[in-house]
């Protein structure tokens, strides 16, 4: 009996000691302050990177050119969000842009333009195109020296096609771009916009990728310029079906 009491007493002392040690550990002065400072440092680092990308966007547009562009202030996975090109002909064109940190204007870079589906249009929210589609991020895996532009258009019709062409020409004019490495893709409604873009100025683009969409534009300009167009769609796509792409392929091939 006495032995059992002794064992219970020892166990109680050990538990009490553990409780005291835990209390002392979590009550150390400066512990919370250190964690808070780490969080502040992380936030400041993200803000610094955003400011650097904004500065990189601004330094490539100066004077009258800068007056035509309003740089964004928020960053998402390396993209500077909601920049606005104020075009006298096509109105305000909202776009997100990824400019590699190494870009300094001393050598030519490739250009990739990605057109969103319905869920990524501008009225759906800033950055929704790159938050819901991975085309811009996948492109980075193929060519590291590449500027990626993700416009947030307002529809999938002629106005958006004209704005896409205007934005492409803006980057070709104001950035050091290799004209033989200009790529474009369109997903769903963005694919319809892409077909209208290619019907108007296919010579701007080296190659095009259309995913889960249909061809709304004319075929002849693409045939004449021999611009490569790649079609990707499920055989039983729930919205478009595969027949529109099969027809477009036959017309262009």
PLM ranges: what are they?
Residues 111, 115-165:
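Active-site machinery of serine-nucleophile hydrolases
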Residues 2-109, 192, 197-200:
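A domain-start/cap signature at the N-terminus of enzymes
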Residues 108-109, 122-128, 161-162, 196-197, ...:
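Short, solvent-exposed loop/turn and secondary-structure capping segments
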Residues 117-121, 153-158, 188-192, 213-217, ...:
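Solvent-exposed loop/turn segments at secondary-structure junctions
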Residues 206-253:
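The feature captures the conserved acid-bearing segment of alpha/beta-hydrolase catalytic domains
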Residues 102-103, 107, 156-188:
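Gly/Ser-rich "nucleophile elbow"/oxyanion-hole loop immediately N-terminal to the catalytic nucleophile
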Residues 173-174, 180-224:
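Primarily recognizes the serine-hydrolase "nucleophile elbow" in alpha/beta-hydrolase
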